[in-house]
Amino acid sequence: MLVILGGLPGTGKTTIAREFARALEAIHIRIDTIEQAIRNSSLAPAEVNEAGYLVAFALAEDNLRLGRTVIADSVNPIELTRAAWREVANRAGTSFTEVELICSDIEEHRRRVETRAADIDGFKLPTWEEVVARDYEPWTEDHVVVDTAALTPDQALANLCAIFSSPHEGEGGTRAEGIGGEGRL
C-alpha cells in the first residue's frame, strides 16, 4: 500500500509520517531528504524538484513491488505529482490512500513555520512568506484531510492508524474517507 501524504510546510507532515511509518513498519520516503542529497552532490541541478520526485517515485515503486507499505512524505502541491504517485501504486499493483495535512489555525501554522529547525544538514526551511506564496492546488480526488491545528501528533497518528486498520482500507486503490463522513480528521 502507498500512503500519499501531502500538505504545506509546517503542517506536521514529517512528524506524523515518521511515527506512522514506525506504527505500520513502513518505508518512509521524504522528498526533502532526497532533494537535499541532490543539492549536496557534485552533479546538483539548479532545479532539483523534478529529480527529487522522480527518485522518490522509483524508490517507492521498488519497495511497493517488494510488498512493503510506503509513506510518501512531500508537499505534493500540484495534481500532476499526486497523479504520478497514484500511477506508481497502480504500476506496482497495490492500493493507495491520499492524506492531506492542513493547519486551519493560521497563527499556529505561522508559529510552527517560524520556530522549527531543519533536521537535514544544509536544508533551508521556507519562510512564512514563502509558504503563503507557494502554489498549492486544491486536492480534487477523494482523500483524508488531517487538520493538525485541532490534533496533537499522537492524536493524528491514532486517527490515521484507526483508518488504516478499518476493513475497507486499501480495497482496489480506493481512498479512505476519514472520520465524520467528510474525509476530515
Residue ranges of model-derived segments:
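P-loop (Walker A) phosphate-binding loop of NTP-binding proteins
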Residues: 8
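Walker A (P-loop) ATP-phosphate-binding motif of ABC ATPase nucleotide-binding domains
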Residues: 2
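Hydrophobic anchor at the beta1->P-loop junction of P-loop NTPases
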Residues: 5
